[in-house]
Curated annotation (Swiss-Prot):
It comes from Staphylococcus aureus (strain Mu50 / ATCC 700699). This is DNA gyrase subunit A. It comes from the Bacteria. Residues 863-875 have a biased composition (Basic and acidic residues). GO terms for cellular component: chromosome; cytoplasm; DNA topoisomerase type II (double strand cut, ATP-hydrolyzing) complex. A type II topoisomerase that negatively supercoils closed circular double-stranded (ds) DNA in an ATP-dependent manner to modulate DNA topology and maintain chromosomes in an underwound state. Negative supercoiling favors strand separation, and DNA replication, transcription, recombination and repair, all of which involve strand separation. Also able to catalyze the interconversion of other topological isomers of dsDNA rings, including catenanes and knotted rings. Type II topoisomerases break and join 2 DNA strands simultaneously in an ATP-dependent manner. PROSITE patterns: TOPO_IIA. InterPro entries: GyrA, GyrA/parC_rep, Gyrase/topoIV_suA_C, Topo_IIA-like_dom_sf, Topo_IIA_A/C_ab, Topo_IIA_A_a_sf, Topo_IIA_dom_A, Type_II_DNA_Topoisomerases. It catalyses: ATP-dependent breakage, passage and rejoining of double-stranded DNA.
Length: 889
């Protein structure tokens, strides 16, 4: 291999070479490719495209020209890079969803909001828009500097005159080396108003500027949430602006709703947004959506329709879509632009100041250019006036000259004319020697003198020049200004949670034996006197019945503890609200239960982070455990282990405690043990627990509750055959944990085994639920108080094969008292005896009739009322059985 001549070898340290070369490359990218100029808001490629369009005469009043022709001309003369990069830049300037004020008028397929690419450049055509002319206006009047192109054969503008603030009007985005810019678009009317205010008050604050410029105005419209992000971006040049789609909830008949999206955030790909929603629905991360379709068209504009299931809350679904999809996103503002050829982070005021200074420079240079041209013309006219005053001598001198040069020299010497004046006289046509032409020259000369005076005044007085800038900006505002598209909504949207959209109200959540769940307003159930038939609380399936019921607020948490010792969590409003007769939805649609897993206890909790509360667990085999409530604050959708136990055991109940309670554990054979909660050491969430009660053969735990020391509460015992009683808590002595307990009721064939042992104050209502789905709500105070060994009194009359499945306490409220007053009234008979009138109702369910009857009895004759009521119940059951037989036939 031949060696290179020594003179062509330049040894350099590789570290220095890499550093300098990379810096050169970085500056080239920053200055010549990625960042816009603060004055015209354009990158070099955009500036070259617009200048190329102007040079080719592709104005709005001319016909479209092929995009390939435009790209080729720009690439050959000004931008020696790939044709694709030039075409993509031109396409973006033509998209009305990318530019607030498009600078290219495209004809053909220039892409869509779904991310579809534009057609090939050989198919599309383009020309300038009307507003683009304002960027280029006066470019040929020495208003800006021109520089050599890449090969030195052409001249190109270093910046455009930009008669409107394009940097903020259309925004900019670009990634350079070590820095990036992202400037949002704005409303032209607001921007020019801001520039006008700045020109009148150079010390104006950004807060005052924001009175004119409310915030970004995106071409896709949509919403901006709050002004804090806008204010931060305008003050510092950096900030995050929350953008949200415009969506409305429409009724579509049959109690169903749909969500209709008509505007989406800026730079969001609509097709990908729809795919994201579909993915969340498919992965069951968002529930309640039945259909999703894109109905966007040229006639309707953007229209994405989301159909919502009948039992779902459209507001909650929409809020979740905002959180998990591009329906709501942010725009990261980073206002970096080239200032005097160097990248700089600028705020709103600085951007407007630099633009205003640029406009003053443009107007000043244009004025100077016009002044030069006016003076040159006046100089020529002065020569013509001299020639007209001495026309005979001028003609004689010209006739006596042998050549043009001799004639010009003779005119200059004889009449003291300049070379330009002499040449103008020689070029003058004979027809201008008429009197009419002389008058025209005089008029033009006088007008020029006035015009020159005006131009000199503009240059001499900065305020006059500034007023001219204002007038021209006002003219552009009046011609191209429009209403803002993006609405700025004020409020705490950044912290919006689902419950902010849900009214807080008391509700009842029921769970059936076959694991169907639903919620109802607590007022659905009417208070009735003891022995009432009850209200049909749900239309149960065959062999299904309500097994559990809790009352809570829609904003409270519900903890679901299963027989397998796992815990799940929902908000009250997340359980679908259905009609009273509805069976509910499968609980697996709300909670991801494992196989053979059923809910054993539902607990309503307002604050899961509380350090003062505990959960006490009891299993069928008599094991108990105490654990801090805060251990259960973070429960995911798949649930977590709440307690560990042996395979032959299962969780019976869980209670919320304050840490200073007495624990009551009751069994099906009517044994009850009471011991202090403090004897239970708090254990971890997954711990096993300790022995709470020693069970006799065939016995098992059926109830767990708590009571205060020296409590005036009572123990309520309800048996499977509908009997119950109240016994003071203090009748049950404290004992050591792990004992056999003491007798709490006499169990016979008449009343059956115990199904519920709980504590009451006498101020609650009691809901008793049967396996037939019948719910009775009665006042606990109406239940007789008996000793520990008593069997109790009848609380509800049961039909054949019916038994009490569950019992729940609910708080009395004003609405309940009103309903109770409507159901029970007192009257005075003819003999002066006060009569009790009670309406007993078997409420309407599919296939059943409504049975009502007024029962009259003396006030203290409770046994008489029960006897009449039981007779009524028998007749109701006969009617129901007859109706059932007719249905079978």
């Amino acid at each position: 291999m031949a060696e290179l001549p020594q003179s062509r070898i330049n040894e350099r340290n590789i570290t220095s070479e890499m550093r300098e070369s990379f810096l050169d490359y970085a500056m080239s990218v920053i200055v010549a490719r990625a960042l816009p100029d603060v004055r015209d808001g354009l990158k070099p490629v955009h500036r070259r495209i617009l200048y190329g369009l102007n040079e080719q005469g592709m104005t709005p009043d001319k016909s479209y020209k092929k995009s390939a022709r435009i790209v080729g001309d720009v690439m050959g003369k000004y931008h020696p890079h790939g044709d694709l990069s030039i075409y993509e830049a031109m396409v973006r300037m033509a998209q009305d969803f990318s530019y607030r004020y498009p600078l290219v008028d495209g004809q053909g397929n220039f892409g869509s909001m779904d991310g579809d690419g534009a057609a090939a450049m050989r198919y599309t055509e383009a020309r300038m828009t009307k507003i683009t002319l304002e960027l280029l206006r006066d470019i040929n009047k020495d208003t800006i500097d021109f520089i050599d192109n890449y090969d030195g054969n052409e001249r190109e503008p270093s910046v455009l005159p930009a008669r409107f603030p394009n940097l903020l009007a259309n925004g900019a985005s670009g990634i350079a080396v070590g820095m990036a810019t992202n400037i949002p678009p704005h409303n032209l009317t607001e921007l020019i108003n801001g520039v006008l205010s700045l020109s009148k008050n150079p010390d104006i604050s950004i807060a005052e500027l924001m009175e004119d410029i409310e915030g970004p105005d995106f071409p896709t419209a949509g919403l901006i949430l709050g002004k804090s992000g806008i204010r931060r971006a305008y003050e510092t040049g950096r900030g995050s602006i929350q953008m949200r789609s415009r969506a409305v909830i429409e009724e579509r008949g049959g109690g169903r709703q749909r969500i209709v999206v008509t505007e989406i955030p800026f730079q969001v790909n609509k097709a990908r947004m729809i795919e994201k929603i579909a993915e969340l629905v498919r992965d069951k991360k968002i529930d309640g959506i039945t259909d999703l379709r894109d109905e966007t068209s040229l006639r309707t504009g953007v229209r994405v329709v989301i159909d919502v299931r009948k039992d779902a809350n459209a507001s909650v679904i929409l809020n979740n879509l905002y959180k998990q999809t591009p329906l709501q996103t942010s725009f990261g503002v980073n206002m970096i632009a080239l200032v005097n050829g160097r990248p700089k982070l600028i705020n709103l005021k600085e951007a407007l100041v630099h633009y205003l200074e640029h406009q003053k420079t443009v107007v000043r240079r244009r004025t100077q250019y016009n002044l030069r041209k006016a003076k040159d013309r006046a100089h020529i006219l002065e020569g013509l006036r001299i020639a007209l005053d001495h026309i005979d001598e001028i003609i004689s001198t010209i006739r006596e000259s042998d050549t043009d040069k001799v004639a010009m020299k003779s005119l200059q010497q004889r009449f003291k004319l300049s070379e330009k004046q002499a040449q103008a006289i020689l070029d003058m046509r004979l027809r201008r020697l008429t009197g009419l032409e002389r008058d025209k020259i005089e008029a033009e000369y006088n007008e020029l003198l006035n015009y020159i005076s005006e131009l000199e005044t503009i240059l001499a007085d900065e305020e006059v020049l500034l007023q001219l800038v204002r007038d021209e900006l006002t003219e552009i505002r009046d011609r191209f200004g429009d209403d803002r598209r993006t609405e700025i909504q004020l409020g705490g949207f950044e912290d919006l949670e689902d419950e902010d959209l849900i009214p807080e109200e008391q509700i009842v959540i029921t769970l059936s034996h076959n694991n169907y769940i639903k919620r109802l307003p607590v007022s659905t159930y009417r208070a009735q006197n003891r022995g009432g038939r009850g209200v049909q609380g749900m239309n149960t399936l065959e062999e299904d019945f309500v097994s559990q019921l809790v009352t809570l607020s829609t904003h409270d948490h519900v903890l679901f503890f299963t027989n397998k010792g796992r815990v799940y969590k929902l908000k009250g409003y997340e359980v679908p609200e259905l009609s009273r007769q509805s069976k509910g939805i499968p609980v697996v649609n709300a909670i991801e239960l494992e196989n053979d897993e059923v809910i054993s206890t539902m607990i309503a909790v307002k604050d899961l982070e509380s350090e003062d509360n505990f959960l006490v667990f009891a299993t069928k085999r008599g094991v108990v455990k105490r654990s801090a409530l805060s251990n259960f604050s973070r429960i995911n959708r798949n649930g977590k282990i709440a307690i560990s136990f042996r395979e032959d055991d299962e969780l019976i109940a869980v209670r919320l405690t304050s840490g200073q309670e007495d624990i009551l554990i009751g069994t099906s054979h009517a044994s009850l043990i009471r011991f202090p909660e403090s004897t239970l050491r708090p254990l971890g969430r997954t711990a096993t627990g300790v022995k709470g009660i020693t069970l006799r053969e065939g016995d098992e735990v059926v109830g767990l509750d708590v009571a205060h020391a020296n409590s005036v509460d009572e123990v309520l015992v309800v048996t499977e055959n509908g009997y119950g009683k109240r016994t003071p808590v203090n009748d049950y002595r404290l004992s050591n944990r792990g004992g056999k307990g003491i007798k709490t009721a006499t169990i016979t064939e008449r009343n059956g085994n115990v199904v519920c042992i709980t504590t009451v104050t006498g101020e609650e209502d009691l809901m008793i639920v049967t396996n037939a789905g019948v719910i009775i709500r009665l006042d606990v105070a109406d239940i007789s108080q008996n000793g520990r060994a008593a069997q109790g009194v009848r609380l509800i009359r049961l039909g054949d094969d019916q038994f009490v499945s569950t019992v729940a306490k609910v708080k009395e409220d004003a609405e309940d008292e009103t309903n109770e007053d409507e159901q029970s009234t007192s009257t005075v008979s003819e003999d002066g005896t006060e009569q009790q009138r009670e309406a007993v109702v078997n409420d309407e369910t599919p296939g059943n009739a409504i049975h009502t009857e007024v029962i009259d009895s003396e006030e203290n004759d409770e046994d008489g009322r029960i006897e009449v009521r039981q007779d009524f119940m028998d007749r109701v059951e006969e009617d129901i059985q007859q109706s059932s037989d007719e249905d079978e036939e």
